[in-house]
């Protein structure tokens, strides 16, 4: 018995040591790993359609190649314009939060906006500066991101099967429900909220640059702020194209009208009413408050990777609460059991 206890202690120590070493190895790569998996999840439907025409491996190679090009553009952009972009972004954020404080919104939103006004700019600064101060580290993380994307997309079916096989036989229903809850949350956050926000931010940045409202750095900063605004309730990216149209109005009425039409078609409200519902109709709905708290709470707590981890954590908590309620309704109360006896 003593020998068994000693052996158990040794194995526990070995397992803890392995976990510690793995964590120390991966802790600086958590963000690219999570984002690589998230990108593969978004790309999976396109991969399925493309693989029917060119084959599974060729489809993965094509999508990985496209993502590699965008990653290279991102790296070059960070190298060339990050300092000026940060300056412009701080100016935009300061003006935006000053305007936001004048809105008459519910108390919990007002508190959230105040918290964002104090923490968001500094959090953004710390995250971006750690890359600008170490471009080799950023390059390494992009390589890891692309490698994870390729491997996850190539083995997506196998990984999905393995996840379900790892579920314990006892309370398997709870495990499956939690997986479905994570899937619903990730679908709503990645394939609807974040996807549309990023696309709108890209269109706004292009519009600001093509219409010469700002330089490259200022246009990128405007696109980033558009993404942030799209994630907030009440407000949205329309504020940015409206601001751009007002700036153009001082130069040319015609340019201001054309840019306003461009903003209506590519940013808001046309995409919100005609495209977004088509993407979201087949997916479970996630409360906008839950998504908002998850995204920005995750951002404040974990940095950029918290945008994904925050909503998933809240989704899992809600799944556990639902399961607890179901168990409570299935089990009769003590009083009821005593009456039956």
Swiss-Prot record:
GO CC terms in record: plasma membrane
Record carries keyword Membrane: yes
Superkingdom of source: Archaea
Transmembrane region(s): 10-30, 62-82, 93-113, 140-160, 193-213, 227-247, 255-275, 289-309
Keyword Cell membrane: yes
Pfam families listed in its UniProt record: AI-2E_transport
Main location: membrane
Membrane topology of this protein: Multi-pass membrane protein
Keywords: Cell membrane, Membrane, Transmembrane, Transmembrane helix, Transport
InterPro entries xref list: AI-2E-like (IPR002549)
Localization per Swiss-Prot or TrEMBL: Cell membrane
Similarity comment text for this entry: Belongs to the autoinducer-2 exporter (AI-2E) (TC 2.A.86) family.
Protein name per its UniProtKB record: Putative transport protein PH1571
Organism: Pyrococcus horikoshii (strain ATCC 700860 / DSM 12428 / JCM 9974 / NBRC 100139 / OT-3)
